[in-house]
Amino acid sequence: MSKVGVVPLIFLVLLSIAALQNGDDPRRQRDEKQSPQGDILRSTLTKYSYNIQRRCWAGGSPCHLCSSSQVCIAPTGHPAIMCGRCVPILT
């Protein structure tokens, strides 16, 4: 390879290394940015969490309080997701 071809090659390699050290890595930029969907979900959960907790205590207990040997049942008798009664699992 001639000197004319080696000089631009070295320049491109050095330029690429400098760009990576300056934080131009798209993976890092993607991790640093927060998605607007996450912000919307977070604000919605914060806004309605009090109502969800209040309904749980009025109609039963939160399902996450059930132990591994219990299942959470809603007042209608169907499995519950958020609130209900902790009932032992029949084996």
Curated annotation (Swiss-Prot):
The keyword Signal applies. This is Conotoxin Im9.1. Probable neurotoxin. Keywords: Cleavage on pair of basic residues, Disulfide bond, Neurotoxin, Secreted, Signal, Toxin. The lineage of its organism: Eukaryota, Metazoa, Spiralia, Lophotrochozoa, Mollusca. Its main location: secreted. Disulfide bonds join 56-72, 63-83, 66-86. Residues 1-23 form the signal peptide. It comes from Conus imperialis. Residues 24-55 form a propeptide. Expressed by the venom duct. Belongs to the conotoxin M superfamily. GO terms for cellular component: extracellular region. It is found in: Secreted. The keyword Magnesium does not apply. It comes from the Eukaryota. One of its GO terms (molecular function) is toxin activity.
